[in-house]
Amino acid sequence: KIKKHLIGQDEAINTITDAIQRASVGLKDPVKPIGSFLFAGQTGVGKSLSAKILANELTKSSDSLVSIDCSEYSAEHEYAKLIGAPSGYVGFEQGGMLTNAISKNPFSIIVFDEIEKASHKVHELLLQILEEGRLTDGKGNTVSFNEAIVIMTSNVGVNEIDAITKSIGFG
């Protein structure tokens, strides 16, 4: 079904569906996310759209897509919005946008859009999600990501690759 919405992305779709199928039969690390993927390419090739279509086809719910625009997290302190402010700080009671979303709907597609624009603190959170499969929010609650699919998008290096392929006679 996904392939009829996304033309020319068969390899990416097959890779994602293979990961989901492996997870459904228990052939994945029980702690880590179902899969983690880096979609790299020029603006407009369907990186973010792929994630939206995947979320709609898998869950039939828009609540299952957690989209994080990493340009909003370029300042070092902004990462607290994802996991919640520590106790004693303003907004502590609200929790974090990412941890709240995963607590409510563990089977989610999380998109870190333009990951290269995020601060190193967001990269550290992402590493913890991918390595350990969990985060601790500002309230001290542990949130598991073992039923989530993590997608990062980027267009870093695309111009360089285009220049190389054109210089050797392709394109």
Summary of predicted features, one role per range:
Residues 1-171:
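AAA+ P-loop NTPase nucleotide-binding core of proteostasis motors
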